[in-house]
Amino acid sequence: YGKEICYIMQNPMTAFNPSLRIGRQLEKTCYLHNPQISRQELQLLVSNTLQQLGLDDLKRILKSYPDALSGGMLQRIMIAAALINQPTILVADEATTAIDACNRIELMQLLRQLCSGGMAILFVTHDLRAASMADRILIMNNGQLVEAGTTQIFNEPKEEYTKYLLSACTLERR
């Protein structure tokens, strides 16, 4: 499925190669699926994708090794690596957990915009606030589907496990 389905890993600290600079890793990710791309187009695509995710100090970021960057910054770069090939399906495994609350909301809005542009996102999360931004919700317990529906699940849960989850957290109702 190559560039059609991309994955945002949960832990960017273990996902990046510690011996390669961030810029090189992003370029390799893009070039793997677009071998005909010119060097100039490649650099522009990498820069634009990082800027789209709110990363501005591009020269420093691109020349850095993963261990020189914060967890939140690496998470945004991990998301950029997944988005750089413009997939039709994006699997996001706890993609916003390493990011502070303010940036998490901004990033969730960006992911929502991507969905309106035709990309589907499978968002795996334990954060019910993040899940409340989805169009469809699947509640799972021990790998088993418990309940499925729209965000209406948060207002009218049918299953006991869903009720238990909702009682364990404070969630602003839509």
Q: What do the predicted segments below correspond to?
A:
Residues 64-69, 73:
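Conserved ABC ATPase signature
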Residues 79, 107:
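Hydrophobic anchor residue at the start of the ABC signature
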Residues 84-88:
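A short, proline-enriched helix->beta-strand linker immediately N-terminal to the Walker B motif
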Residues 90-93:
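Catalytic Walker B motif of ABC-type/P-loop ATPase nucleotide-binding domains
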Residues 132-139:
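Conserved catalytic segment of ABC-fold P-loop ATPases
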Residues 140, 152-174:
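C-terminal boundary and immediately downstream tail of ABC-type ATPase nucleotide-binding domains
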